[in-house]
Amino acid sequence: MSKVVERFLKYVKYHTTSDENSNTFPSTEGQLIFARELAKELKELGLSEVEVDENGYVTALLSANTDKKIPTIGFIAHMDTSPDMCGKDVKPQIIENYDGNDIVLNKEKGIILSTSEFPELKNYIGKTLITTDGTTLLGADDKAGIAEIITAIEYLINHPEIEHGNVKIAFTPDEEIGRGVDKFNVKKFACDFAYTVDGGELGTIEYENFNAASAKIKIHGRNVHPGTAKGKMKNSILIGIELQNMLPELERPEHTEGYQGFYHLNNFQGTVEETSMYYIIRDFDKQAFSDKKEYIKSIVEALNKKYGEGTVELELKDQYYNMREVIEKHMHIVETAMEAMRSLGIEPKVVPIRGGTDGARLSFMGLPTPNLFTGGHNFHGKYEFIPIHAMEKAVEVIVKIVELYGKKG
């Protein structure tokens, strides 16, 4: 069994689900336990400046082995797994020499990873896959990234003939709940640029992501006995439905792909008296993003005009921005990663991130950080899987990026 697989199978045993309702940082104790174990492993490998700080960030340095002027590169992955699915007691299954048929994840519960629902499986006939047992997520997002980074660093340590500058690594908590770099010290990390290793299928590289905002809406109704309600009742639930129906139907997640943005109603709770709604608003284009926010404001204004001032309250908050505008000023970071892939026989696929990453926020904090593939598929659920050869290729790509910058200086 290769080292990257060994590490990955060990890491997924740690229960590191993050919790958006927690007020602590990190949000769960399990992440701190995992952080300390990773720090211990990094020390054993011989890295310097290994630290788990008070916020649970793990950082370490592989010192340069040459006097050449070479940029300091960072590699970053996150320790938490998504709260969307249970991440406790993960029991990975290894499917050797995959035959192209449906994979029974859990016979007892009738859970099947089917080729009709997940046609990408057909790309991995003859390969070895790691799947879930159908009761939890797998945790390839992002424990595969952690395993790949550490294995690449170990390779560089064992191959001193590869000249390199300083290489920094960081493992962050709470990425899945949007807090991953809230307390990250970019200045102390002291890199010229970095890569998150948090992407999907083999060969993907991502340097543009959604602009993101949240919209919290509170609707104040007026409850009156329905028998005497004529001309008096104001049903906040129905006003909420009216608001939703005023948004463009085709601009919902289920109707969009590629570079298309959306409004997503993520939560709706209400009574006649009071209703709360929570939206996320996403778009790649800056102007379209601004237009979407203005449009939801105009709907709220129209409803307040119709039902009375103060009926609908809107709290609109920007969350993160498209890192493309930062990365485009430093395209050598993307170009070198693509060169590394091609030299290893991997065709790079530039895809937009229909979401956000730690790298998006880091880019606006002064650390340009595109995202590299881990090799995984179907993150955040029981159908998550990862091909072993893709993990091994991710290790090679990280090593090659470091090597190329060592040569370029």
UniProtKB/Swiss-Prot annotation:
GO CC, alphabetical: cytosol
Cofactor: Zn(2+)
Active site residues of this protein: 80, 175 (proton acceptor)
This protein's name: Peptidase T
Compartments, record wording: Cytoplasm
Ligand binding (Zn(2+) 1): 78, 141, 198
One Gene Ontology term from the biological process aspect of the record: peptide catabolic process
Cofactor note: Binds 2 Zn(2+) ions per subunit.
Family to which the UniProt record says this protein belongs: Belongs to the peptidase M20B family.
EC number: 3.4.11.4
Major site of localization recorded for this protein: cytoplasm
GO molecular function: metallopeptidase activity; tripeptide aminopeptidase activity; zinc ion binding
This protein's record includes keyword DNA-binding: no
Known role: Cleaves the N-terminal amino acid of tripeptides.
InterPro entries the record matches: ArgE/DapE_CS, Bact_exopeptidase_dim_dom, Peptidase_M20, Peptidase_M20_dimer, Peptidase_M20B
Pfam families attached to this UniProt entry: M20_dimer, Peptidase_M20
Keyword vocabulary terms for this entry: Aminopeptidase, Cytoplasm, Hydrolase, Metal-binding, Metalloprotease, Protease, Zinc
Residues that coordinate or bind Zn(2+) 2: 141, 176, 380
The protein's enzyme class: hydrolase
Top-rank taxon: Bacteria
Chemical reaction(s) catalysed: Release of the N-terminal residue from a tripeptide
